[in-house]
Amino acid sequence: MRPEDKKKVVEDLHVRAEKAKLAILTDFRGLNVAAMSELRKGLRAASAEYQVVKNTLMTLAIEGTDLEVLKDELKGPCAVCLAYEDPVEPTKALTEFAKNNKKFEIKIGVLDGKLVNLDGLKALADLPPREVLLGQIAGTLNSLPTGLVQCLAGVPRKLLYALQAVRDQKEAA
């Protein structure tokens, strides 16, 4: 690759690294073209992209970004998955792909500028999508006022029942 081409790759990757909310390093050795195409297609559907980049170029590209913590992890053949929206969906796609392709290995990830190990990535993959989580939170927040109203209305209701019982008792006597 010519130096001008390398510079362009670094600049392009730097821009994408700045926008990425999540980055996951993988070992792609042993994957054929069809498997790589399948993986890329699944990641595109999850608003992410997958690229094989030389470690030296990747090191230059992530300088000054949240992904800079990956510098020490760039050893051996690496490919990077960059997610720009919900970090859960691409992580799910990668872990599913790793289950189905024994040669594919997830190394480590970065979320919000912090390294996330394989166990953390698996836990992230088990989370429901962002929209579902927001719906659960909204439902919980909505149930709090409803429960409070029910609780507050219970005291006068019980008083009315007691008064009704006293009235019925006096009428019967």
UniProtKB/Swiss-Prot annotation:
Report keywords, A-Z.
Ribonucleoprotein, Ribosomal protein, RNA-binding, rRNA-binding
One GO term under biological process is:
translation
* Gene3D superfamilies (alphabetical): 3.30.70.1730, 6.10.250.290
Gene Ontology, cellular component aspect:
large ribosomal subunit
Q: Record's SUPFAM superfamilies? A: Ribosomal protein L10-like (SSF160369)
- Report the function annotation for this chain: Forms part of the ribosomal stalk, playing a central role in the interaction of the ribosome with GTP-bound translation factors.
State the family named in the UniProt similarity comment for this chain.
Answer: Belongs to the universal ribosomal protein uL10 family.
The record, for PANTHER family, names: 39S RIBOSOMAL PROTEIN L10, MITOCHONDRIAL
Q: How does it associate, per the subunit comment?
A: Part of the ribosomal stalk of the 50S ribosomal subunit. The N-terminus interacts with L11 and the large rRNA to form the base of the stalk. The C-terminus forms an elongated spine to which L12 dimers bind in a sequential fashion forming a multimeric L10(L12)X complex.
**By what name is this protein known?**
Large ribosomal subunit protein uL10
Gene that produces this protein: rplJ
